[in-house]
Amino acid sequence: DIRILGKGGHAAQPHLCVDALEVGTQVVAALQRIVSRQINPIEPAVVTVGSFHAGTAFNIIPAEAVLSGTTRTFNEETWSVWASRLEKVVAGVCGAMGAGYEFQFSRGYPPTVNDAAVADVVRRCAISVVGEDRVVEPELTMGGEDMSFFLKRVPGCFYCIGVGREGAAPLHNPRFDFAEELMLLGVETHGRVAMDLLG
């Protein structure tokens, strides 16, 4: 979270204020430049500000703005320095515009990186259970996953078993219809993976 601390006042007297809303918009724009100008362009990275709250009336310059967002990357080094990079940008923009700030960064999940050898075992076992035409390798995604903490300590593979119904609402939707009968395929796949890895 980023809290911009400005000086509020009447909209007709902006010269007597430090407009936290304006400072916040500059912060949002500057944060996007971390990805476009400070990270290798062949390395996927995301900085998203998903929440921005400032002001309570059309004719009052707000003294405070609150921004919240998230960062994502597949690179462990980039993941470990997000906080310092973000705060440096916030401090620079706020300093240039005469505002103060409060900065709080929650690190969240590290990148989820599968072990190639274990992933091969999972793929082979899944094919033996559901057939090659039903096993797909999805595109990389920036979604966070707590499995990443396990994969940092032990070689493994994060994989998903489709349990949606044709034409039904997707996962993370209040109308999602979980196909319980497909859990048996997941159990069989897990069992075969365990037997294969245990030799």
Where are these regions (language model features)?
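Conserved phosphate/oxyanion-binding catalytic-loop motifs
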Residues: 2
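Short, solvent-exposed loop/turn segments at secondary-structure boundaries
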Residues: 13-16, 81
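Metal-dependent amide/peptide-bond hydrolase catalytic core
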Residues: 22-199
